């Protein structure tokens, strides 16, 4: 506790930087070894989906790591510190998301054999809708990745003096390098290693913190006495930052927009060998998410007990709540060289996993949605080179954009969920319209996307300009009375630097800011977890209404496989290229078996239209299922099998 009382600024030592450097080297080595095995990537399909040969375990852990970035490593403990253990309800929202993704969205994407999620929007609506989805995704991912890269570097710099540009460049360059060289397989297997590092960092902090404060019983007693064990918060007020309802309603839809239809996640589970493996990957992902979130939340409770009546934010030792966790690590491990470096590796493992995922996914949608439709005759090797080049470009762009995230207020966790909610929420609505409402048409979905984006962006900007008060968000009280008293007893005088300038336990001011608009304490004050739900609901309602007014689409005009309602119960298996020869006799055949009006010259493979035609023929013939397809339009490799 000496460091707590003296107020000295702790720093990382040589051993800590050594552990951090080791994590970077191991990540690079894994990425290069896995990515270059078996001669590297022979096609863009290999680069973006690993040849669709990946097993459930690594894919599941990669899914859990992709959005468990340094933002969560630093943000979740600080939120649990300030709002209590009710943050564990986030795990329920994630569970509902995993179930809905496995039952509703994953089967459609998997059986269509898509590489780009937004290809579905063109198949269901039009190319204009596909381009809107692609551009929205790239913007959202660039902003989110900027937060993930910049925010932890800034926080650690403010707390420990860690050089901000050294940390940015080291993680950014290494991540971009192994992603560009190794592709999807490199990203997945480095994610597996980084999940292990993240969990190890949390568990070491938990064990040491619990030991220092007197054991688990002491932690539970003090947390209960200070209202931190508050799982039974069912307040329906949408302005309360965290309640059961914000996590179950708002949280579920935010996570659904990130897992159900987000390119980064869809790209992973469609890379699994079979649909059953993809569902198993989502289950493993849920276990990983639960372990990470629960460990982070428990760290926040232990951190509160450690700093009981000695809040470092009130004492001025830190300047923002996101800095609690790195300060705690340095305080409790000050006499154990190298251990704080494990937490540093933990935080940046999250950064590497998220950034590599984002870079690979942005390159994938650029190739599939913007390049291939224009340059259909490109050879596979050229597409691989272009894909690697795009990975380098997007990695450099993410480093450049990272500084913009410093403009976001409210904490790194809120900033990341705000970006994903505002932009991905309306996109989720577009996919819901496509898969579940046959009557929805192109004008309807475009109008819905515009309305959903406008409304969610409006409330997010309003909340940024006029943030709600701590009383409105229901921040729990904390105090620095014990440390102030210790300072008085030691010197006989009260050091002005130790005066709690913003003691959260004091009564709120009764004055009202006349410059705040009327919406500031109502509409703008709703929990940031509802931004995505607001965008999704607006998109669905507006899209359905406009579709009815402009002439609904007839269900008979839609190709089979585009609606969830038409899915058969059987699951799909997407075979690797070398196994195509041993598939059963029900494969969709080559161009020589096409009907007369659809025959192609020798050497040409079925196009997207042929694929949908044969899917319809399968259903008419009573096959009871329809056929998945792997590849892309016009001359791409086809790999198809019964479901």
From Swiss-Prot:
Chief subcellular location: membrane
Protein's cellular compartments: Cell membrane; Cytoplasm
Topology of the protein relative to the lipid bilayer: Multi-pass membrane protein
Tissue: Expression is primarily in thyroid tissue, but also to a lower extent in mammary gland and ovary. Expression is reduced in tumors.
The keyword Transport is assigned to this record: yes
Biological process, per Gene Ontology: cellular response to cAMP; cellular response to forskolin; cellular response to gonadotropin stimulus; cellular response to Thyroid stimulating hormone; iodide transmembrane transport; iodide transport; monoatomic ion transport; sodium ion transport
Segments on the Cytoplasmic face: 32-56, 106-130, 182-189, 267-278, 364-386, 438-441, 551-643
Residues binding Na(+) 2, per UniProt: 72, 144, 258, 416-417
Family: Belongs to the sodium:solute symporter (SSF) (TC 2.A.21) family.
Name used for this protein in its record: Sodium/iodide cotransporter
Species of the source: Homo sapiens (Human)
């Amino acid at each position: 506790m000496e460091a707590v009382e003296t107020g000295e600024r702790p720093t990382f030592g040589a051993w800590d930087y050594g552990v951090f450097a080791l994590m970077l080297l191991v990540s690079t080595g894994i990425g290069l070894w896995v990515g270059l095995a078996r001669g590297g990537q022979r096609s863009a399909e290999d680069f973006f989906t690993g040849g669709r040969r990946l097993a459930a375990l690594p894919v599941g852990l990669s899914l859990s790591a992709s959005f468990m970035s340094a933002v969560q490593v630093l943000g979740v403990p600080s939120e649990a510190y300030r709002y209590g253990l009710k943050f564990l309800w986030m795990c329920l929202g994630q569970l509902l998301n995993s179930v809905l993704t496995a039952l509703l969205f994953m089967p459609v994407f998997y059986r269509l054999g898509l590489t780009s999620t937004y290809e579905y929007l063109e198949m269901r609506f039009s190319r204009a809708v596909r381009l809107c989805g692609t551009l929205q995704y790239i913007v959202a991912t660039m902003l989110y990745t900027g937060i993930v890269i910049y925010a932890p570097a800034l926080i650690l710099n403010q707390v420990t003096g860690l050089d901000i540009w050294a940390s940015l460049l080291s993680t950014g360059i290494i991540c971009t390098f192994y992603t560009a060289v190794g592709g999807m397989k490199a990203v997945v297997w480095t994610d597996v290693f980084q999940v292990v590092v993240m969990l190890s960092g949390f568990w070491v902090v938990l064990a040491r913190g619990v030991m220092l404060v007197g054991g688990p019983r002491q932690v539970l007693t003090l947390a209960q006495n200070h209202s931190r064990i508050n799982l039974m918060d069912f307040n329906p007020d949408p302005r309360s930052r965290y309640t059961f309802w914000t996590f179950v309603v708002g949280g579920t839809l935010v996570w659904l927009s990130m897992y159900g239809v987000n390119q980064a996640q869809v790209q992973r589970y469609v890379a699994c060998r079979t649909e059953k493996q993809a569902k198993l990957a989502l289950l493993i992902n849920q276990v990983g998410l639960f372990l990470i979130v629960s460990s982070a939340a428990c760290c926040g409770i232990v951190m509160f007990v450690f700093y009981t009546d000695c809040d470092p934010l009130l004492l001025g030792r830190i300047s923002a709540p996101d800095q609690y966790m790195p300060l705690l690590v340095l305080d409790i491990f000050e006499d154990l060289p190298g251990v704080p470096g494990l937490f540093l590796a933990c935080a940046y493992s999250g950064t590497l996993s998220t950034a590599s995922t984002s870079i690979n996914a942005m390159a994938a949608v650029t190739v599939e949605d913007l390049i291939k439709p224009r340059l259909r005759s490109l050879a596979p090797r050229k597409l691989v080179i272009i894909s690697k080049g795009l990975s380098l470009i997007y990695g450099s762009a993410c480093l450049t954009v990272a500084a913009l995230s410093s403009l976001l207020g409210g904490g790194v966790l809120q900033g990341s969920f705000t970006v994903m909610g505002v932009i991905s929420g309306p996109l989720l609505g577009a996919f819901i319209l496509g898969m579940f409402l046959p009557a929805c048409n192109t004008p309807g979905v475009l109008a819905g996307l515009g309305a959903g984006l406008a409304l969610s962006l409006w409330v997010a900007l309003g909340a940024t300009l006029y943030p709600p008060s701590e009383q409105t968000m229901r921040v729990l009280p904390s105090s620095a009375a014990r440390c102030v008293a210790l300072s008085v007893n030691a010197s006989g005088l009260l050091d002005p630097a130790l005066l709690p300038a913003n003691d959260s336990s004091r009564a709120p001011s009764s004055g009202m800011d006349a410059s705040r608009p009327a919406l500031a304490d109502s509409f703008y004050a709703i929990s940031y977890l509802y931004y995505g739900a607001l965008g999704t609901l607006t998109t669905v309602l507006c899209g359905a209404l406009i579709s009815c007014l402009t002439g609904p689409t007839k269900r008979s005009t839609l190709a089979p496989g585009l609606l969830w309602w038409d899915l058969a119960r059987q699951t799909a298996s997407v075979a690797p290229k070398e196994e195509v020869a041993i598939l059963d006799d029900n494969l969709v055949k080559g161009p020589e078996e096409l009907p007369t009006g659809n025959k192609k010259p020798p050497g040409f493979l079925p196009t997207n239209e042929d694929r949908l035609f044969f899917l319809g023929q399968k259903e008419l013939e009573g096959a009871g299922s329809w056929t998945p397809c792997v590849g892309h339009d016009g001359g791409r490799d086809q790999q198809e099998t019964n479901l």
